[in-house]
Amino acid sequence: MSNYVNDMWPGSPQEKDSPSASRSGGSSRLSSRSRSRSFSRSSRSRSRVSSRFSSRSRSRSRRSRSRSRSRRRHQRKYRRYSRSYSRSRSRSRSRRYRERRYGFSRRYYRSPSRSRSRSRSRSRSRSRERSYYGRAYAMARGRRYYGFGRTVYPEERSRWRDRSRTRSRSRTPFRLSEKDRMELLEIAKANAAKALGTTNIDLPASLRTVHVAKETSHGIGVSSNGAKPELSENVTEDGPRNPSEKPSQQRSIAFSSNNSVAKPIQKSAKAATEETSSRSPKIDKKKSPYGLWIPV
C-alpha cells in the first residue's frame, strides 16, 4: 500500500520516468521552437513592413522634392516683376553694359557672395525703407503692387485708340482745308448771331475773309480780273528786296575851316517830303485787303 502511494505521489521517480513526462517535455520543446519561428517570422514581416514604409517615405520625399522644384520653376515666371528679381536683373544688366563698354572681365565686377544667414528683421527693415521709393517708381513706370507691396505686376497699357472711339485711327495730325475753314467760320458766325441776337457783326480785320491772290510760276500775283498788279520798290522782278538794306545815297559833305568834322548838308523840309512820297509804294486801296500802309 505504501509502495502504491509512493508510486502515485507527485514527486516520485516513477512519474519522472513515465512516458507522459517525456511527452510533456517534447511538447514544451516544440512550443519553444514554434515560438522562436513565429518570432522570427514576425520580425521578418516587421522588417519588411519597415522597409516598405521607408521606401514609401523615400519615394514621397522624392516626389515632394520634384514638386517643389516644379513649383519653383513655375513661380520663376511670375517672379519676373518682383523687387528682388528686378534688382538682380538690373545689376546683371549693368555688369553686362560695363563689360561691353569698357571690356573688363567678370571677375573684377563679381560681388562677394551674400551670406544666407541674414535675419528676417534686417531684410524686413530694408524692405520697409525702400517700399515707398519702389512704389513711387512702379507707379511712374505704370505698374501696380499686389500683396503688401511684395510683387509688382505691369498694368495693361491702354492705347490712345481705345480711349475714345471718336478719334481718328491715323496718327497723322488732322488738317483742315480752306473750304472747311470757311464753312466753320460761317457756322461760327451764325452761332454768334443767334447768341447775341444781331444779324450783322463787324468782324475784326484778322477774321475777315481775304481772297488770296493766286501765285503763278514766276512768283507774280494775279488777281481774279487778270490784271497785272504794279510792282512796288520793295518787290522787284528778280525777287523781294530785303527791307534791312538801305538805298545807297551819296550825300554831299560840307567842310568848314572852323570845324574839322565833316557834316552832311541839311536839306529843306519840302525836299524831304517829296523824297518820302516818291519812296512810298504805290498801293491801290481797292486791290489790297489791308488798305494803305503808312511807313513808320
Swiss-Prot record:
Residues where Omega-N-methylarginine is found: R141
Chain segments carrying region Disordered: 1-131, 156-175, 217-296
Cystine crosslinks: none
Compositional bias per record (Low complexity), positions renumbered to this chain: 20-31
InterPro entries tied to this protein: RSRP1
Domain of life: Eukaryota
Keyword Phosphoprotein applies: yes
Compositional bias (Basic residues): 32-125
Compositionally biased spans, kind Basic and acidic residues: 156-165, 272-287
Family that this chain belongs to: Belongs to the RSRP family.
Name the UniProt record assigns to this protein: Arginine/serine-rich protein 1
Organism of origin: Macaca fascicularis
Taxon lineage: Eukaryota, Metazoa, Chordata, Craniata, Vertebrata
Gene: RSRP1
